[in-house]
């Protein structure tokens, strides 16, 4: 029997329409909606934003991430969010660039990055994309359609205060062995 203190948790849902979520001109509004909804929740042990609530790569939004991480740190909160992640170190070692659908933990006593292992066909990757590239050449240049990579099966759990969190993104919860492994 493990004994750890309970966590006070806030789940934030911005209800951003899918047809607007990834539009460049709507990204600032999306971030404002989530930041506004979170404002009164700082001070909770854990604040959770949903999958891809930040609709841009971490490399393109460093000032926003730094501000959110600082707010979490200042209030003693851990902040967990969904964000597409461009792994620059991996991309320098191999081609093509490595993009992931991820969950990132940061803030007070929080750390970790989980890279989704079970990708949605035709949503996060195109099956047989090498064979289809001559039919759909635009797919090769669109990371939101064909560029997501699978995360490794042996990832370290996210850490939030004294807790280790098993992660699952989207339909990964339909794979009980994966979910169980991620939680151990």
Spell out what each predicted region is.
Residues 1-184:
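Enzyme catalytic cores with a strong preference for nitrogen-chemistry domains
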């Amino acid at each position: 029997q493990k004994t750890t203190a309970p966590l006070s948790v806030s789940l934030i849902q911005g209800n951003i329409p899918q047809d607007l979520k990834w539009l460049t001109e709507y990204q600032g509004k999306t971030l404002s909606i989530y930041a506004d909804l979170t404002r009164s929740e700082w001070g909770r042990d854990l604040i959770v934003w949903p999958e891809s609530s930040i609709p841009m790569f971490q490399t393109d939004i460093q000032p926003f991430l730094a501000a959110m991480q600082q707010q979490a740190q200042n209030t003693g909160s851990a902040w967990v969010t969904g964000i597409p992640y461009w792994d620059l170190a991996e991309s320098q070692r191999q081609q093509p660039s490595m993009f992931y659908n991820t969950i990132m933990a940061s803030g007070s006593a929080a750390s970790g990055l989980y890279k989704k292992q079970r990708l949605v066909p035709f949503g996060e990757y195109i099956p047989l994309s090498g064979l289809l590239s001559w039919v759909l050449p635009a797919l090769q240049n669109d990371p939101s359609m064909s560029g997501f990579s699978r995360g490794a099966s042996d990832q370290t759990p996210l850490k939030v205060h004294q807790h280790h969190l098993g992660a699952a993104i989207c339909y990964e919860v339909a794979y009980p062995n994966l979910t169980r492994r991620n939680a151990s």
